[in-house]
């Protein structure tokens, strides 16, 4: 976590609390740090999401292919997570995809802060996102994908057409 960005996030959240404003999902940017290449890539949402205001799914724009809402960018209200009954299979990698996907329809209000809060370091051998490691764990990825697919009937359970479109990819 970036210290200055975390301080900004906490200040924003305190402001919501002081004004008695409910925000179900706080969204921020994240940065991929490719350690061995010495490069980094920031993933932000400033053209897809409204900034500096509370918004709903019906106010979102279109996401580019590289703008997925991943665990690194999402901070849910605790009661939203509890109500989601996240099905987390034990001893399984890639469950962060369940965390990033299943609670979304329960989020009625969101806030996007254009801050680089989380830095994700990639490139270590044996890391779960390493290509060779992913191939060995395809069964786990399939298990997670099936859980995500079975979590909703997108046309029956997801009210917002814009959220549905995002969730369908």
Regions found by a protein language model. Give the residues of each.
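Donor-binding/catalytic cores of nucleotide-activated saccharide
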Residues: 1-113, 118-136
């Amino acid at each position: 976590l970036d210290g200055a960005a975390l301080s900004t996030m906490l200040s924003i959240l305190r402001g919501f609390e002081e004004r008695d404003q409910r925000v179900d999902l706080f969204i921020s940017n994240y940065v991929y740090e490719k350690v061995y290449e010495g490069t980094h890539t920031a993933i932000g949402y400033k053209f897809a999401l409204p900034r500096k205001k509370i918004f709903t799914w019906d106010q979102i724009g279109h996401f580019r292919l590289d703008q997925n809402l991943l665990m690194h960018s999402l901070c849910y209200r605790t009661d939203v997570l509890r109500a989601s009954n996240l099905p987390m299979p034990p001893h399984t990698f890639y469950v962060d995809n369940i965390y990033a996907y299943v609670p979304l329809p329960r989020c009625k209000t969101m806030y996007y802060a254009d801050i680089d809060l989380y830095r994700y370091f990639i490139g270590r051998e044996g890391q779960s996102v390493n290509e060779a490691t992913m191939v060995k764990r395809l069964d786990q990825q399939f298990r997670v994908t099936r859980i995500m697919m079975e979590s909703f009937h997108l046309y029956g359970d997801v009210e917002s057409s814009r959220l549905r479109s995002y969730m369908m990819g």
